[in-house]
């Protein structure tokens, strides 16, 4: 790989933003895009009446409900780095899509609501990041409102998440009393409300301001200095190595809504966040600077533009250089393909991509060739990256088309939404009626909404009273083993499994059939 290309790859910073719903994830995403010069003003998800919707929320149901249910991909340049942001679903039901997204990034930014602290969804996503060993940067948001005390938030972060923390800055007051941020890294105080030339006040060797200033009269100024002294003496030592290893999280305080502390966070993040690294494959570790092009499909999205009825496969480039029109191999099928139609996104705005390098995320127009987890490369025709995990659904519904004359629309919609991973599909053993499985209730709502809006198919869904899926070997697939509490079905790959009513039904099945092995996904 040439030095120029190595430099280009090193400039990539690809990360996901994770949080609990309503922690301010979409707002901070928009402020980052503002600093990247991509948008002129940040729209707010909550201001529905203004008609301004969040840049990253493009699907109709997201605009209506103010939640992210798909993962958007956004790119911009900042201070010599090419930033790729993946805005993950902020709703607890969408763990599958989020998990796949986290497989495609090199670091994560965790947004926490200062009033609520660590919430269930944040903890779940954090564990996935820890499992992958990627660096986690923490932004404690909503400091313009009254919330938990900063020291309490730090203690919660360390106790609940089990990770070292190092505050990069420290709030001087909060809510109506918020006066500024004491920036330990850049050795300045950033004022909350000030003229531009007075926004950053330099600190002296003693840790106090070099020159006297009105901010020192703030009720919380002396308290902040005392807390900083405590952190210096009793807190964790700053360690770039531990940050990169995912063992220490740098913590930033701020307010995304008032755009306070966000640019300082971005500037520091760009300094610390890792560039694209290696990926495990069946042929060993593939380094980002490997000259051969390779990547994997982590997401498929149909109807991003309803007018065009298109379908996009999102690929994370793992190594080498992509050039539009290049020939590659889809290793699952061994099929040779020409990548002529490639695109990059800013929510629902798109532009053609002529070249991209390791770390970049691009969209490929898909006519049905790709599946989630596919590897494509112009190197070894047998190369395959690690499989993306699939979750075991916990809710199941039988699904029918209301209008039997529109079966074609119905089947096309189900097939496409299953292929993009929006829902999982099962079929009854003999009659092959459709049963759909989801991790959470909202997935069914999104499925119904998209079937109606994108495929013109009104559907009816009925609960089947089963909650647990367990796969069996083909030789053990006997319909006579089905009971009122268990049901033999097949998945989209025709693999047999039983759907059980509850744990009691599984235990009963195991007692009656000790030789049959039941297996689960994640």
UniProtKB/Swiss-Prot annotation:
- SS bond partners: none
Compartment(s) where it occurs, according to its Swiss-Prot or TrEMBL record: Cytoplasm
| Record: residues binding GTP | 19-26, 87-91, 141-144
Q: Which organism is it from?
A: Listeria monocytogenes serotype 4a (strain HCC23)
Molecular function as annotated in GO: GTP binding; GTPase activity; translation release factor activity, codon nonspecific; translation release factor activity, codon specific
The Swiss-Prot or TrEMBL record describes its family as follows: Belongs to the TRAFAC class translation factor GTPase superfamily. Classic translation factor GTPase family. PrfC subfamily.
Instruction: Identify the keywords attached in UniProt to this record, alphabetized.
Output: Cytoplasm, GTP-binding, Nucleotide-binding, Protein biosynthesis
Role this protein plays: Increases the formation of ribosomal termination complexes and stimulates activities of RF-1 and RF-2. It binds guanine nucleotides and has strong preference for UGA stop codons. It may interact directly with the ribosome. The stimulation of RF-1 and RF-2 is significantly reduced by GTP and GDP, but not by GMP.
Q: Which CDD domains match?
A: RF3, RF3_II, RF3_III
Q: Tell me the Pfam families matching this sequence.
A: EF-G_D2, GTP_EFTU, RF3_C
- Give yes or no: UniProt keyword GTP-binding: yes
Q: Name one GO cellular component term.
A: cytosol
Q: Name one GO biological process term.
A: regulation of translational termination
Protein name listed in UniProt: Peptide chain release factor 3
Source taxon at top rank: Bacteria
